[in-house]
From Swiss-Prot:
Gene3D superfamilies according to UniProt: Urate Oxidase
Function: Converts GTP to 7,8-dihydroneopterin triphosphate.
HAMAP family per the UniProt record, alphabetical: GTP_cyclohydrol_B (MF_01527_B)
An MF annotation (GO) of this entry: GTP cyclohydrolase I activity
Pathway: Cofactor biosynthesis; 7,8-dihydroneopterin triphosphate biosynthesis; 7,8-dihydroneopterin triphosphate from GTP: step 1/1
The name this protein goes by in its record: GTP cyclohydrolase FolE2
Organism the protein comes from: Bdellovibrio bacteriovorus (strain ATCC 15356 / DSM 50701 / NCIMB 9529 / HD100)
NCBIfam families per record: PRK13674.1-1 (NF010200)
Length: 304
């Protein structure tokens, strides 16, 4: 059987049978993408979603192979950028001009970034989950970046309760009838009896999605979130780094509501962040459940 005579049931058209479909395509296509780093461009594994609408004329299906081959051709040979994703969506529509008015491409990967230690001269690699995407509706393209930042959150309520216990311990160990000896008190504070309680803290996650321009770098969004929260988890840690981390946690006590408001304030101050939605999950060490909060700019992005 020749190629010309191979059947293609996707081309069947029966208006009474085939209703329009919002999105159809492929999810989690396995592709390597070219990611720019400070010292060069490297191939990293990624998962790609490639979709178009099926809404121009009644048809049983789209051209799946066209989406796959275009994704493979364009995304594996050029440096990954939002502008490149916009080009991909334009090609999706060009090859489906008789079928589709909208196209979407989404690339999910782990971004390796070098982070400096808090105090020492060390640095460490961190891996950040990132999703970059482009949405094209009849030539109008929107760009999005989504990141997940891991941070530490120390409970303000637990901190207050711990301070009260420390005060009680001080009262029990030092009489008001005698003058306090600075050296004795200073030494006592350095013992387990001096700091008898500590507040509960936990690893926490900020998931942030932003609408941005075509030239935006996902690393900038990660930096904004980490700077707002101040307690991003660390890689290489010496004692001076761990002490600084303890200080930052003590100076940045956070409920999940506090984390949300901090990041909202930081994002609202950035003109190149057009819209955003974010959720915060504190994986509680006190409870078997998480404490969660959700914010948005209040425009189009209201959920992920």
């Amino acid at each position: 059987m020749t190629k010309q005579s191979l059947p293609d049931v996707a081309k069947e058209t029966h208006s009474e049978r085939f209703a329009p479909i919002d999105w159809v395509g492929m999810g989690a296509i396995e592709l390597p993408v070219m990611l720019k780093q400070a010292d060069g461009v490297y191939r990293i594994p990624a998962r790609v979603d490639a979709k178009v609408s099926l809404d121009k004329k009644p048809s049983r299906g789209i051209h799946m192979s066209r989406l796959y081959l275009l994704s493979q051709e364009l995304l594996t040979k050029s440096e990954l950028s939002l502008g490149l994703l916009g080009t991909v969506t334009s090609e999706f529509l060009r090859t489906h001009e008789d079928l589709s008015t909208k196209a979407l491409v989404q690339v999910q990967f782990e971004a390796p970034l070098v982070r400096k230690a808090l105090k020492s001269n060390n640095q460490a690699w961190r891996s950040y989950p990132v999703i970059t995407s482009a949405f094209n509706e009849e030539g109008q393209i929107s760009y999005f970046v989504e990141v997940v930042v891991t941070y530490s959150s120390t409970c303000p309520a637990s901190a207050a309760l711990s301070r009260q216990l420390i005060q009680d311990g001080f009262k029990q160990n030092f009489s008001t009838d005698k003058p306090l000896d600075f050296d004795v008190v200073h030494s006592w504070l350095g013992t387990p009896q001096g700091i008898v309680a500590t507040p509960h803290a936990q690893r926490s996650f900020a998931r942030v999605k932003a609408e941005v321009g075509a030239n935006y770098n996902y690393g900038d969004l990660i930096d904004i979130v980490e700077e707002a929260l101040q307690t991003a988890v660390q890689g290489a840690v010496k004692r001076e780094d761990e002490q600084e981390f303890a200080l930052r946690n003590g100076q940045n006590l956070m409920f999940c509501e506090d984390a949300a408001r901090r990041v909202k304030e930081a994002l609202d101050a950035k003109a190149d962040v057009l819209d955003y939605v974010a959720e915060f999950s504190h994986v509680e060490s006190l409870h078997p459940h998480n404490a969660v909060s959700h914010i948005s700019k209040g425009l189009k992005l209201r959920s992920f």
